[in-house]
Amino acid sequence: MVSGTVGRGTALGAVLLALLAVPAQAGTAAAADLPAPDDTGLQAVLHTALSQGAPGAMVRVDDNGTIHQLSEGVADRATGRAITTTDRFRVGSVTKSFSAVVLLQLVDEGKLDLDASVNTYLPGLLPDDRITVRQVMSHRSGLYDYTNDMFAQTVPGFESVRNKVFSYQDLITLSLKHGVTNAPGAAYSYSNTNFVVAGMLIEKLTGHSVATEYQNRIFTPLNLTDTFYVHPDTVIPGTHANGYLTPDEAGGALVDSTEQTVSWAQSAGAVISSTQDLDTFFSALMSGQLMSAAQLAQMQQWTTVNSTQGYGLGLRRRDLSCGISVYGHTGTVQGYYTYAFASKDGKRSVTALANTSNNVNVLNTMARTLESAFCGKPTTAKLRSATSSATTVERHEDIAPGIARD
């Protein structure tokens, strides 16, 4: 173990690095074609994120049973408690991958057709019968993202909804006030509205809450003991990292945004988890443990986002500088940035978290954890490529994607 301290104001920061050897399963030796994770590079990313305004940051890499864990800074600015990789946090839009898994399991069970109209299952919900389940799950429905209105002003918008409880229909109504942004299937346009519809589909087809379906289909089978869906409760259970929202105004004081209902997101963004549980989840997903091979292939039918990113069905693909593609999701919710991705075979996974948001510099810096985790120590050429590709990271796409903040 390597440890040290980093000062940040009056709060104590901590750096942790641990390598834990865990017996690998038979026939699942670490993928030989992946370079070893670059722990020095990971630590540098966390240090940079703190210098850019994050109170704390952490990353956990599961390399086929060998665990790399690093953390720096604080979980709680008031007490100075150091952040650790066991702290729970709000995962934001990583929730979309959980919702997508449930829907694809329902396809496997013959209860859902990806190419059927959403209105087949939820009559009259959407203004166009041509909008399909597949288009909703791939952000090609044209449904306007209501969070653009909610969070046009970051802190006032958050304070106006932090204790509110919305119904799914409330959120759909907010979206439909604007009409659609494009014809069904015509374009990729990220919208939280799509995964509100996903939650409605889950509840209609199963007769259960999304909380029950997440628990029975994912949390319990994978033994995700740090993962919860507590909406509309405002408290994160157990030991957790506090979240700190950066105001739009330069130099404004960070706002403790830890406690909120997240009712504005629900099945689009209200899950709570940990680095270990998200690593476990995406490893299980990519190794085929959560659905049939046919549905996993459907999940990976990509729509182009930009030159280095694609979006499937509740799943992101990122193409890294070393030629490796990784699969998972990003998450932004007030006070938390999350990156959670795995290799194609699920044998290596990484989850990175900074406990701030509305800070584009931290957002783009934390994306570099993927390069260090999957591409290893950079050559000069890789370093130039990684630096260039960092500028293409989506900026605040997971929340209020239509609002420019930088």
Curated annotation (Swiss-Prot):
The keyword Ubl conjugation does not apply. It catalyses: Preferential cleavage: (Ac)2-L-Lys-D-Ala-|-D-Ala. Also transpeptidation of peptidyl-alanyl moieties that are N-acyl substituents of D-alanine. The active site is at residue 93. InterPro entries: Bact_CellWall_Synth/Modif (IPR050491), Beta-lactam-related (IPR001466), Beta-lactam/transpept-like (IPR012338). Its EC number is 3.4.16.4. Gene3D superfamilies: DD-peptidase/beta-lactamase superfamily. Pathway: Cell wall biogenesis; peptidoglycan biosynthesis. GO terms for cellular component: extracellular region. Residues 387-406 are annotated as: Disordered. Keywords: Carboxypeptidase, Cell shape, Cell wall biogenesis/degradation, Hydrolase, Peptidoglycan synthesis, Protease, Secreted, Signal. It comes from the Bacteria. The keyword rRNA-binding does not apply. Residues 381-406 form a propeptide. Residues 1-31 form the signal peptide. Residues 393-406 have a biased composition (Basic and acidic residues). Substrate binds at residues 151-154, 190-192, 316, 330-332, 357-358. GO terms for molecular function: serine-type D-Ala-D-Ala carboxypeptidase activity. It is found in: Secreted. Belongs to the peptidase S12 family. PANTHER family: D-ALANYL-D-ALANINE CARBOXYPEPTIDASE, D-ALANYL-D-ALANINE-CARBOXYPEPTIDASE/ENDOPEPTIDASE AMPH. Catalyzes distinct carboxypeptidation and transpeptidation reactions during the last stages of wall peptidoglycan synthesis. Mistaking a beta-lactam antibiotic molecule for a normal substrate (i.e. a D-alanyl-D-alanine-terminated peptide), it becomes immobilized in the form of a long-lived, serine-ester-linked acyl enzyme and thus behave as penicillin-binding protein (PBP). This is D-alanyl-D-alanine carboxypeptidase. It comes from Streptomyces sp. (strain R61).
